[in-house]
């Protein structure tokens, strides 16, 4: 990597105002600092400064992958549809999540631009791995991925193309898979520590990659503007993405009702209004929420979920449960789960639904007779609702509720499920003495124990020691390289600009010449740049014909860790050394600049195991 660069010769144009397209501070700063430029929504050019950052991140990732036995390769970006159909994920990625770019070539064959490479790598393993003697194997690549995001936003956080490292491991048994999974866990932790980031590892939902039963963990870079909510215990014994988190809900209040009764409750279509009208706690109310599940055989299923009034539905957990019920409806997988809004309810063509006053026994007659609509409502009850006695719920008539209701008396108890959303303030399920706290995070890495999810449908097998054919055990491990770069900015910036961690900064030091017309300032700067480069210190030389104030503002904006200024102190044989992170400025002798910076940079790059 080039050790020094004159800023006057670089393609470098900064912006003084925040671009209107940007929402996050990190997105604004990357645009203003000439790190990226948008070509179209979700598609960005990586300019020279950011490209250096991405190269450094990639090299750290590469070193840590190689250290645990990973072998680098490069897989095709263009993938035939048939291998996705073989794994059973074509419909999920083109219809349900709809994030895959699908196209037809001139022969009419369906292709896709790879959002991920499980199918490609499994096909490769099926072709090349024959015997247990070849196992385990870990392959990885660093390349551009494509996802057709519905709403690309936040710069590199949610783009339509992005740089990612994805690794895949193959094993003879589950024990070997778990060992590599732990190796990856440690490698990912080292990557983020080496990149200078504060992070937390959390239990996570495996999504369409792993499926509802796969073990997985996410690596979250902590940032107040993070898209994901994390729940964790203060002692560090538990942390999970809110999509996966479990907890003990607060206890319900004691019911004042001892007998079943129908009450007129006009204008109480929300839990808040009903609780205020009856002067009761929302913990005594069973709310009933309608959803529609769409399976891959085209069947739509109305789902009525009963849950305690003070709780929210975790739709990821609900979708996972409905995925496990696919066989019940002669389907392979769930394509989509949606709240049954007015449009969906009208599409059912049944009796009117008393929205806001629905009871657990809402009649099936709200569903019309249709070919692709299940004739009966699937009824589920969250544990929080199932435990209530003498509760309040809808009366199946607009303006009416019932009080003093009980399961097994007025209403049959539906199938009981755990689909509530854990929240801050709940007690930890694993240690009830710990109260869950919340933080925001940016998902940077995700590791999965896939098990046999891909090897079974794609017939990827090996011959074991007894000569029997066995399916390969598999893991996959992703880390967003371009996403990590922006996450670092989101975590570390101030009002003046970016504060890059030393390990991934585009340059270690920027040498600023306040007045290029001063021969002494220029000659000292030139000598310093040469000496720093010789010492292996990456140096940006701001030799532009600009005012000193502009140069200082730009230096702060682009976030180079150290700034050397050849200014007034030259008369005393000194230059000014400013640390970007702290803003601390000191004057040091010119002859001590190289050794001082070398010591500081080496200290910053030293990461304990």
Swiss-Prot record:
Reaction(s) catalysed (UniProt annotation): tRNA(Pro) + L-proline + ATP = L-prolyl-tRNA(Pro) + AMP + diphosphate
Pfam families assigned: HGTP_anticodon, tRNA-synt_2b, tRNA_edit
Cross-referenced InterPro entries: aa-tRNA-synt_IIb, aa-tRNA-synth_II, aa-tRNA-synth_II/BPL/LPL, Anticodon-bd, Anticodon-bd_dom_sf, Pro-tRNA-ligase_IIa, Pro-tRNA-synth_IIa_bac-type, Pro-tRNA-Synthase_IIa_type1
Transmembrane segments: none
Enzyme class: ligase
One cellular component (GO) term of this entry: cytosol
Superkingdom as given in the UniProt entry: Bacteria
EC id: 6.1.1.15
Alphabetized PROSITE patterns for the sequence: AA_TRNA_LIGASE_II
Biological-process GO terms, alphabetical: prolyl-tRNA aminoacylation
Keyword Magnesium: no
Transferase among keywords: no
GO MF annotation terms: aminoacyl-tRNA deacylase activity; ATP binding; proline-tRNA ligase activity
Localization terms from the record: Cytoplasm
Keywords: Aminoacyl-tRNA synthetase, ATP-binding, Cytoplasm, Ligase, Nucleotide-binding, Protein biosynthesis
Family according to the record: Belongs to the class-II aminoacyl-tRNA synthetase family. ProS type 1 subfamily.
Subunit architecture: Homodimer.
Job description of the protein: Catalyzes the attachment of proline to tRNA(Pro) in a two-step reaction: proline is first activated by ATP to form Pro-AMP and then transferred to the acceptor end of tRNA(Pro). As ProRS can inadvertently accommodate and process non-cognate amino acids such as alanine and cysteine, to avoid such errors it has two additional distinct editing activities against alanine. One activity is designated as 'pretransfer' editing and involves the tRNA(Pro)-independent hydrolysis of activated Ala-AMP.
UniProt remark on domains: Consists of three domains: the N-terminal catalytic domain, the editing domain and the C-terminal anticodon-binding domain.
NCBIfam families given in the database record: PRK09194.1, proS_fam_II
Record's protein name: Proline--tRNA ligase
Native organism: Synechococcus sp. (strain JA-2-3B'a(2-13)) (Cyanobacteria bacterium Yellowstone B-Prime)
Gene behind the chain: proS
């Amino acid at each position: 990597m080039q050790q020094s660069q004159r800023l006057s010769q670089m393609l470098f144009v900064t912006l003084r105002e925040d671009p209107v397209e940007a929402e996050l501070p990190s997105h604004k700063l990357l645009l203003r600092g000439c790190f990226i430029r948008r070509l179209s929504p979700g598609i960005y050019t990586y300019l020279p400064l950011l490209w250096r950052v991405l190269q450094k991140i990639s090299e750290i990732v590469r070193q840590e992958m190689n250290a645990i036995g990973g072998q680098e390769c490069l897989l095709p970006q263009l993938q035939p549809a048939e291998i996705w159909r073989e794994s059973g994920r074509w419909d999920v990625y083109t219809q349900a999540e709809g994030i895959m770019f699908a196209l037809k070539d001139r022969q009419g064959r369906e292709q896709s631009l790879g959002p991920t490479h499980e199918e490609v790598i499994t096909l490769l393993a099926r072709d090349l791995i024959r015997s247990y003697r070849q196992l385990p194997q870990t392959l990885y690549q660093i390349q551009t991925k494509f996802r057709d995001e519905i709403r690309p936003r936040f710069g590199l956080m949610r783009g339509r193309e992005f740089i990612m490292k994805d690794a895949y491991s193959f094993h003879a048994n589950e024990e070997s898979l778990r060992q590599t999974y732990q190796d990856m866990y440690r490698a990912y932790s080292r990557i983020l520590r080496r990149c200078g980031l504060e992070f937390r590892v959390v239990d996570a939902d495996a999504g369409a990659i792993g499926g509802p039963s796969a073990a997985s963990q996410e690596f979250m870079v902590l940032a107040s503007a993070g898209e994901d909510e994390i729940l964790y215990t203060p002692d560090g014994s538990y942390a999970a993405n809110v999509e996966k988190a479990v907890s003990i809900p607060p206890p319900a209040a004691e019911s004042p009702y001892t007998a079943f009764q129908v009450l007129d409750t006009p204008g109480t279509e929300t839990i808040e209004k009903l609780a205020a009208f009856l002067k009761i706690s929302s913990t005594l109310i069973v709310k009933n929420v309608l959803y529609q599940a769409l399976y891959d055989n085209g069947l739509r299923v109305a789902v009525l979920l009963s849950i305690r009034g003070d709780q929210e539905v975790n739709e990821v957990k609900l979708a996972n449960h409905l995925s496990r019920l696919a066989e019940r409806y002669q389907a392979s997988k769930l394509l989509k789960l949606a709240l049954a809004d007015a449009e969906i309810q009208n599409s059912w063509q049944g009796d009117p639904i008393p929205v806001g006053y629905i009871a657990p026994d809402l009649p099936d007659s709200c569903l019309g007779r249709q070919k692709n609509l299940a004739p009966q409502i699937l009824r589920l009850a969250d544990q929080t609702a199932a435990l209530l006695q003498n509760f309040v719920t809808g009366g199946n008539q607009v303006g009416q509720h019932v009080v003093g209701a009980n399961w097994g008396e007025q209403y049959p108890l539906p199938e009981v499920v755990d689909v509530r959303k854990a929240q801050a303030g709940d007690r930890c399920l694993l240690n009830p003495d710990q109260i869950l706290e919340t933080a925001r995070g940016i998902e940077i890495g995700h590791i999965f124990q896939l098990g046999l999810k891909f090897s079974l449908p794609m017939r990827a097998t090996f011959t074991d020691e007894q000569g029997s054919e066995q399916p390969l055990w598999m893991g996959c491990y992703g880390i967003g390289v371009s996403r990590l770069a922006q996450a670092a900015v989101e975590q570390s910036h101030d009002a003046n600009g970016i504060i890059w961690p030393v390990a991934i900064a585009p340059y270690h030091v920027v040498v600023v010449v306040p007045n290029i017309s001063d021969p002494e300032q220029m000659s000292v700067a030139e000598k310093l740049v040469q000496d720093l480069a010789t010492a292996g210190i990456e140096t940006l030389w701001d030799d532009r014909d600009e005012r000193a104030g502009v140069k200082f503002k730009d230096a702060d904006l682009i976030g180079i860790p150290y700034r050397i200024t050849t200014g007034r102190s030259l008369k005393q044989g000194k230059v000014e050394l400013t640390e970007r992170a702290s803003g601390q400025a000191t004057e040091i002798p010119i002859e001590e600049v190289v050794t001082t910076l070398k010591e500081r940079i080496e200290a910053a790059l030293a990461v304990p195991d």
